[in-house]
Amino acid sequence: MILKFKFLGSILLLIGLWGCTSGDDIIDYSQDLEISDPAPGSTPGFNKDRNVYFGDLHVHTKHSFDAYIFGTTATPDDAYDYAKGGSIKHALGYDMQLREPLDFYAVTDHGFLLGSVPDWADPNNGKAGTEPFHNLNIPENLNQESVAARSVLFQSYVRNIANFSNIWTRTVAYVTGDTARGSTLYDVDVHRTAWKDVIQSAQRHNDPGNFTTFVAYEYTSSTARSSNTEGAAPLKCLLTGAGCNFEGSPPHEGGNLHRNVIYKGNKFTVEPFTRLKSLNPEDLWSWMDELRENGVDTLAIPHNSNGSNGQMFEMENWDGLPIASQYAEFRMRNEPL
């Protein structure tokens, strides 16, 4: 029994050490900017009570796993150029252009495994298990005939994203309640480099008074999608690999709890808060509260709530307890829309 508790203590200690490299350090990009924020009301014709502005706060580029798998090679810079009226190539090769440029825009790539799939597509990446992705989006593979194969690859990606290579990774995934922690293909340097690209691109294209950009990303959480209703896969499944069903379930069991997280100002974390840290949106809000105390303001906007199977606006919290005024204040502070 003593040995058992020592083993559990070691697991919890190592998980705690894992958390120490959370990427919550804050970087101030103010010195990198050549422009300053305009004075209030300096936008030509500005009227806060009468003007309507049009934009998009949900945009994926090649840094998002789903977009890249289905042929998107556009960068954040490409996306912002498109929003300002430029043309952009569709994955099938034809040009697209807006009739009129937008007023505001935010690239919101999935924070989860941000930038990973383009890295896997490089045949020289040296990462075992990425072979199906090699050369995925080279020109000769970007055609309509590849759609079916890409769909199969995407489904395989979803099924195998938790690659439980040993008991340790399976145990960590079980204790944290997040199967994605078992992935052996997560490269923190690739992740942070892609996030830095998202930040710097938004900063480059921000033109106060004419075109407003926001540094942002998508927090991609979801609820349990197996016959287990407690929210985490059974230990037997994680340790043996038997009977696991993480991606498919009756529609009333699983749901998407995605949020677009928008930053204000010029200070940003080294990496975004993702489902690798917690599937619980309330943990996202706590992280946002902590950032606010350190001078970084953020806003979360529920996304695709119709895909949550009614769980985006439950009358109970993540732990199944009835919501109260404290919960309402907590959520409204971070997610007022």
Predicted regions and their residues:
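Sec-dependent N-terminal signal peptides of Gram-positive bacterial secreted proteins and lipoproteins
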Residues: 11-15
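Bacterial N-terminal signal peptides that target proteins for export
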Residues: 1-8
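Extended, charged catalytic domains and RNA/DNA-binding interfaces, predominantly
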Residues: 21-337
